[in-house]
């Protein structure tokens, strides 16, 4: 078994539940409203449209969140941590590698304006899903690629889109997709200063970058 001390050094190893940090019962305090969508409650309620939720992990959540809030049909976004063991972790705890979480974006969208398939297309094309426990220069289990699905239909769509994108990646000489696709676990929201970070800090770091590979037009969203 890998020791906890080794995980602090080797950023490619996930902890077991027994090794994970204990966390806390109290969630992080969040602002009431979205910084970009002024007047929109960060976590709802959302009264207009046919609302659904999607959860994506594609590297540093600052840049990922910005790309999704820029998409027409998205009504809110929240960044957080998911897929691990530690309840209500801090950013520093997640960066230690001892929570098991990856950085995620919760995307709230109006299905009348943008489909889940559209968002999946964005997800695959915005990052490199073959890199395992890293994304570009960002190394660690918290940067691993994941799709956490809120319904069986989302799970089926995610797997179908993965297979289609894998075919295109293989043609371009890339390796196997390492993206985790699973039913949605609990999402623990990140600290307030992380929410819509690049809107508050336009010159802030953004390490997100795709492969240049696209889904064929027949399989893309709108």
Swiss-Prot record:
Any Gene Ontology CC annotation: cytoplasm
Any one GO biological process: cellular response to oxidative stress
Keywords: Oxidoreductase
Disulfide linkage: none
Active site: 60
Catalytic activity from the UniProt record: L-methionyl-[protein] + [thioredoxin]-disulfide + H2O = L-methionyl-(S)-S-oxide-[protein] + [thioredoxin]-dithiol; [thioredoxin]-disulfide + L-methionine + H2O = L-methionine (S)-S-oxide + [thioredoxin]-dithiol
Keyword Oxidoreductase in annotation: yes
SUPFAM superfamilies on file: Peptide methionine sulfoxide reductase
Listed InterPro entries: Met_Sox_Rdtase_MsrA_dom, Met_Sox_Rdtase_MsrA_sf, MsrA_MetSO_reductase
Transmembrane spans: none
Superkingdom of the organism of origin: Bacteria
Pfam family, one: PMSR
Protein name (Swiss-Prot/TrEMBL): Peptide methionine sulfoxide reductase MsrA
Organism: Pseudomonas entomophila (strain L48)
């Amino acid at each position: 078994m890998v020791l906890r001390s080794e995980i602090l050094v080797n950023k490619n190893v996930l902890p077991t539940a027994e090794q994970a940090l204990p966390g806390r019962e109290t969630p992080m305090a969040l602002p009431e409203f979205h910084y970009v969508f002024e007047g929109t409650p960060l976590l709802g309620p959302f009264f207009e449209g046919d609302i659904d939720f999607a959860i994506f992990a594609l590297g540093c959540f600052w840049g990922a969140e910005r790309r999704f809030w820029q998409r027409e049909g998205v009504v809110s976004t929240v960044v957080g941590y998911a897929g691990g063991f530690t309840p209500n972790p801090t950013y520093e705890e997640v960066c230690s590698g001892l929570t098991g979480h990856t950085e995620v974006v919760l995307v709230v969208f109006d299905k009348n304006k943008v489909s889940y398939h559209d968002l999946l297309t964005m997800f695959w094309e915005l990052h490199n899903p073959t890199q395992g426990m890293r994304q570009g220069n960002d190394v660690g289990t918290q940067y691993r690629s994941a799709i956490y699905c809120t319904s069986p239909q989302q799970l089926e769509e995610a797997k179908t889109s993965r297979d289609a994108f894998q075919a295109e990646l293989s043609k371009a000489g890339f390796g196997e997709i390492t993206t985790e696709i699973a039913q949605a676990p609990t999402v623990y929201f990140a600290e307030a200063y992380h929410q819509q970070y690049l809107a508050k800090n336009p010159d802030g770091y953004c390490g997100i970058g795709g492969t240049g590979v696209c889904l064929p037009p027949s399989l893309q969203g709108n």
